[in-house]
Amino acid sequence: MRIHYLEIVCSDADAQCAALEQVHGVSFGSPVADLGNARIAEASDGSLIGVRVPLAEHEQPIVRNYYEVDDIVKAVEEAEAAGGVIAFGPTRIGDTGNWAIYFFDGIQLGLWQR
């Protein structure tokens, strides 16, 4: 199981990026519209870290892991069969791939197919 994308939603994306750059030695780029204007950095293992502010008033700060999967539809079906509640079904994001979010035991988990 590999984390493809680590999403950090916070109130001050610039401050969060600066802290992550200082502590972890990564470098964040400009906001990416397809990813909710998240600023993206690539970790040493090739996984992506995205930092953005909430997209809606109801959205709260959160850190969400998106696990890489080969088949997003199958992974969503398996998550649901395991008792997960699908929050967002498979959704295409520009050229970045397909993602989905499900809840399990109060935790939000993401799936990502490149």
Enumerate the language-model features and the residues they cover.
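N-terminal beta-strand motif that seeds the catalytic metal site of vicinal oxygen chelate
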Residues: 1-17, 63-65
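Vicinal oxygen chelate
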Residues: 1-4, 8, 29-30, 80-114
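Short alpha-helical
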Residues: 14-15, 73-74, 97
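Conserved active-site tyrosine of GNAT-family acetyltransferases
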Residues: 16-21, 79, 106
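Conserved short beta-strand elements that form part of the metal-binding/catalytic scaffold
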Residues: 26-61, 103-104, 108-114
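Short hydrophobic/aromatic beta-strand element in the GNAT-like acyltransferase core
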Residues: 40, 66, 98-101
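Mid-chain, well-packed structural core segment of small domains
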Residues: 61-88
